[in-house]
Curated annotation (Swiss-Prot):
One of its GO terms (molecular function) is peptidyl-prolyl cis-trans isomerase activity. This is Foldase protein PrsA. It is a lipid-anchor. InterPro entries: Foldase_PrsA, PPIase_dom_sf, PPIase_PpiC, PPIase_PpiC_CS, PrsA_foldase, Trigger_fact/SurA_dom_sf. The lineage of its organism: Bacteria, Bacillati, Bacillota, Clostridia, Eubacteriales. SUPFAM superfamilies: FKBP-like (SSF54534), Triger factor/SurA peptide-binding domain-like (SSF109998). It comes from Clostridium botulinum (strain Loch Maree / Type A3). The keyword Signal applies. It is an enzyme of class 5 (isomerase). It catalyses: [protein]-peptidylproline (omega=180) = [protein]-peptidylproline (omega=0).
Length: 335
């Protein structure tokens, strides 16, 4: 009797294992994959189709295929890139879900009629960009992964999100004294015309090399000649000449730019350390213009500072909201 019970138990266990394994081995249908849950935010599901049909994700896939070929998604490298992109966009979808939930909580969601009206207005604004050419508008929608319906739904969500962000940042203020401080510290940004300087430099790897270069230049050796001999930058063939540079050039290393601005016309710097190595900088000439009066730029400065503070406040608030939310991600369902 005991043997029979044991056998029955083993058989039942075997059936369970086989059933479980079989279920795990059965490939999901495209419909089932589309409906599979990839994340939950406070109990609300984000499904695989929300990600796969997301216009941002579609654009990424389209760009990858154009660059690497139609089979890119099937390669190991392609799968890794797709997974990484999906994770990034999923994080954006989670953020949007948190914001939309907050919209309900804060009671800032307009009534359906008003929301549809606002969304239609935004659609018409987009159409106006294409001179109300319906064909061009539809071609652009298709190329960006939208349909008319999904665009409108997207815009409705963005309207709600904008209202939530406004609510979260409504306490942000910028005083005149904040603008005055920024103006005093960044006067080169507020000139009648952009200040520029004509710059040459010599780039070497170590500080010792830079000191040797400076010593040669202090001994009145020709800057261009020394640059051609020792510089490790592409500008060496031009004697280290970089040409005219704006004081607000965001493409330059900030440390390099700050050191160059501080030099007088004709001056040569001591070694300046940046991420690229050690530079010796020479200012060949400068064009500096009068600074605008504070009152003429005050409102622009306040607007800029307010936007920056609002961004900081929003980032802090969304991190706080996400931390307080119950968020679960189902990684295995992403691919």
């Amino acid at each position: 009797m005991r043997s029979a019970k044991k056998l029955l138990s083993v058989l039942c266990l075997g059936v369970f294992i086989l059933t479980f394994t079989a279920c795990d081995m059965v490939e999901k249908t495209p419909e089932a994959k589309a409906k599979s849950t990839i994340a939950k935010v406070n109990g609300e599901k984000i499904q695989r189709k929300d990600l796969d049909e997301n216009p941002r994700f579609k654009q990424v896939v389209s760009q990858m295929k154009m660059q690497y070929g139609e089979e890119f998604e099937k390669s190991e490298q392609g799968k890794e890139v797709i997974k990484e992109q999906k994770s990034q966009i999923l994080d954006e979808l989670i953020t949007e879900k948190v914001l939309l939930q907050k919209g309900k909580e804060l009671k800032v969601i307009p009534k359906d009629e008003e929301l549809n009206k606002e969304a239609d207005k935004k659609v018409n604004e987009i159409k106006a960009v294409y001179n109300n050419d319906e064909k061009k508008f539809e071609e652009t929608l298709k190329s960006t992964g939208f349909t008319k319906e999904t665009l409108k739904e997207y815009l409705k969500d963005q309207i709600v999100i904008e209202k939530v962000i406004n609510e979260a940042t409504k306490g942000v203020k910028v005083e005149d004294k904040d603008a005055q401080k920024y103006y005093n510290e960044n006067q080169s940004m507020f000139t009648e015309k952009p200040n520029t300087m004509n710059v040459s430099h010599i780039l070497v790897k170590t500080e010792d090399e830079a000191k040797k270069v400076k010593k040669r230049l202090d001994a009145k050796e020709d800057f261009a000649k020394v640059a051609k001999e020792v510089s490790q930058d592409g500008s060496k063939d031009k004697g280290g000449l970089l040409g005219d540079i704006s004081y607000s050039d965001s493409n330059l290393d900030p440390t390099f730019l700050k050191a160059a601005i501080a030099l007088k016309e004709g001056a040569i710097s001591n070694p300046v350390h940046t991420q690229f190595g050690y530079h010796i900088i020479k200012i060949n000439s400068k064009k500096e213009y009068p600074v605008k009066k504070f009152d003429a730029v005050k409102e622009d400065i306040k607007k800029q500072l307010k936007q920056e503070k609002q961004q900081e406040a929003y980032t802090k608030k969304i991190e706080e909201w996400k931390k307080a939310s119950k968020i679960k991600i189902y990684e295995k369902n992403l691919l």
